[in-house]
Amino acid sequence: MSVDNWLLHPLWGQTFLLLLSVAVAQAHWPSEPSEAVRDWKNQLEASMHSVLSDFQEAVPTVVGIPDGTAVVGRSFRVSIPTDLIASSGEIIKVSAAGKEALPSWLHWDPHSHILEGLPLDTDKGVHYISVSAARLGANGSHVPQTSSVFSIEVYPEDHNEPQSVRAASSDPGEVVPSACAADEPVTVLTVILDADLTKMTPKQRIDLLNRMQSFSEVELHNMKLVPVVNNRLFDMSAFMAGPGNAKKVVENGALLSWKLGCSLNQNSVPDIRGVETPAREGAMSAQLGYPVVGWHIANKKPTLPKRLRRQIHATPTPVTAIGPPTTAIQEPPSRIVPTPTSPAIAPPTETMAPPVRDPVPGKPTVTIRTRGAIIQTPTLGPIQPTRVSEAGTTVPGQIRPTLTIPGYVEPTAVITPPTTTTKKPRVSTPKPATPSTDSSTTTTRRPTKKPRTPRPVPRVTTKAPITRLETASPPTRIRTTTSGVPRGGEPNQRPELKNHIDRVDAWVGTYFEVKIPSDTFYDNEDTTTDKLKLTLKLREQQLVGEKSWVQFNSNSQLMYGLPDSSHVGKHEYFMHATDKGGLSAVDAFEIHVHKRPQGDKAPARFKARLAGDPAPVVNDIHKKIALVKKLAFAFGDRNCSSITLQNITRGSIVVEWTNNTLPLEPCPKEQIIGLSRRIADENGKPRPAFSNALEPDFKALSIAVTGSGSCRHLQFIPVAPPSPGSSAAPATEVPDRDPEKSSEDDVYLHTVIPAVVVAAILLIAGIIAMICYRKKRKGKLTLEDQATFIKKGVPIIFADELDDSKPPPSSSMPLILQEEKAPLPPPEYPNQSMPETTPLNQDTVGEYTPLRDEDPNAPPYQPPPPFTAPMEGKGSRPKNMTPYRSPPPYVPP
């Protein structure tokens, strides 16, 4: 009881305060005392419930999670209160309603209980998310306990832009960027990344935004991340731009942007050095994990809200004002939320109203938003029921225009009967020229709104009478739920040409595409060019045919084509822009088709033989463009302009093309080898990656890569061995090494080896020159040496140059050798008895015989004595005429 008494004291205090507030309320609103008392009772009941809730056992109920909204390109984050759904020991499962997994753009973190993601343009619409709790059963299966379903509606990229800017921040003191005025452009900084958002998981997208948030210190809700559309990486309206660290774009590209201010220019833009320098030097790329292609700053025009069309609650009787409604008021779109016993979402039925952008007003008001000069006037007779006119059906008394543009005829607004709820029928009713007075049609129950028909061309020959009801009826009062003057009475104005397309350049065999800029035309009612209907025509108001080499997609407003050699020259086309009212503006421009960009100088020619008949490919421009796109995709190039189609011939389908990314000079052999290995093996068999890129439209049979231009002597992938009768072809170079090793070998081959050879030649030449010089100088004396030996004479030997170690020989010692042998005996003469020799010539001996036998008693011949003194008449040098001593006599050992 003490606890109860302690709890009742604050209860009585609260009761006293409530009674005091009731008294004050009664003093101010004495006419409604019952409401104040009833409000007091409710507050008292709530107070009692809050005091005694701790002592009551809570009944497990399903807690509803509020619905959420997301915007394309913006981060979405919501915390799921799992503690209110699941108790201890239960497992939380989050998935799409009726499915096993979440949508592809959402990520669930079971630890932090946060559901986050970043939707793309393909994720627009309403997504129903189911949060269920399950308990592990005895058999190991999960037994569902409770479940809750909520919805997330994804709006387009330009929807509700200021709300994302004015998002509440976690820090109360944080300065939230102010929204710009309605007509004021928003200055946006955009960073281009070499990434593909479609290949990322939701977690990777959010992590990319978080890394950019930590790098740039920009709040997460202020950043936008969208993929690149139509290869438009850079904005042509940017007034500031800079490069990144990426040299080549590989992926599709992603644009990460945030707001800088309102209508800034180059002088008033804030300091961007924190983006410019890191993007160029690679610091931003290292932080984000993706290469940065560049950045730019541009002013974006705000997107004007589209005028909405609503059903008109009117009666067939013309009155000055619309009275109270007699039909049931349509309820806003409803959604079926499953209970814990049936967690599945029921399929949509015929009782569900069509989705609308804004809630349907509760009061019976009429909102009329028309485009063009359309005046709501009552008709003279009963209104005909809605009729769907088939193609080729002629309605009597009706003006039939010569040209009907589909997609711009307004739907007929109908009145919903009081007891039924139907979907809005999407039918169009032509306006009758003369009101019908047939009595059989006087019981009309579904009056129709005045339809919008295209303006008739003056060439119409129908002359049916037309009744103009402009002043015969009283003016109709129109109520609108929004402020502003209705535009129903304003005349439709013709679109204006703001910026000419002027000229488009194209090359033979190269695919091109041109996105019509949004500022080309402008219409006061329909605004920019992307809201208008564009049509490409020839000079004679003739539409471009399906087989023309130039095609135009009116939905994406993209002009593309693939010219061949017969289209070289200048071609004139006309772009017609038509608004919703049928008025149009025209811009004339020229397409200049040039010859092939590389001509016959391409370093390599790629040739592929495909299965099938070449005639359908040659005659169908769409198939040719598809083939070029597939070839570019097989090489890893997203830009199709890198492929130049040379020829398509017979022999199945023989396609010959060149790659515009290869340099012309010098021969890029390594790059060609790399491209060849990517699509085929050494024998010319297509690789699986190349075949998969062409399938299912084309099937590759064989591939050949032949050098041309600077590489004309090389053949990289042979198609077939040369025939015996043909001349000897150059040897095929089969690359059997890695490209890096081949590059190093080329460096040695073209740089190191020639340098060594030249150095060796110079060294040998130097050695030969030095030898020749030394040989020529040998035997020649210098001037000093020549001066020394210029006089002839006996050399002078000084006294100190003599060897005096041995004493001179004594005079008593004979001058002959001590071991000298005795002299030979004297010769024998012919007078001796036995001659020692026999004359060689007997005739000669016979001549001298009488001389020997003349005097036998004569003495033997005695030789004369030797000379002891010089002969007279010959002078000799006097003694001691030289200043040096004679050398010592020879002394035998």
UniProtKB/Swiss-Prot annotation:
InterPro entries tied to this protein: Alpha-dystroglycan_domain_2, Alpha_DG1_N2, Cadg, Cadherin-like_sf, DAG1_C, Ig-like_fold, SEA_DG_dom
Pfam families per UniProt: a_DG1_N2, DAG1, He_PIG
Comp. bias regions, Polar residues: 830-844
UniProt-recorded name of the protein: Dystroglycan 1
Region (O-glycosylated at one site): 47-69
Annotated Pro residues bias: 857-868
Disulfide linkage: C180-C262, C667-C711
Species name: Mus musculus (Mouse)
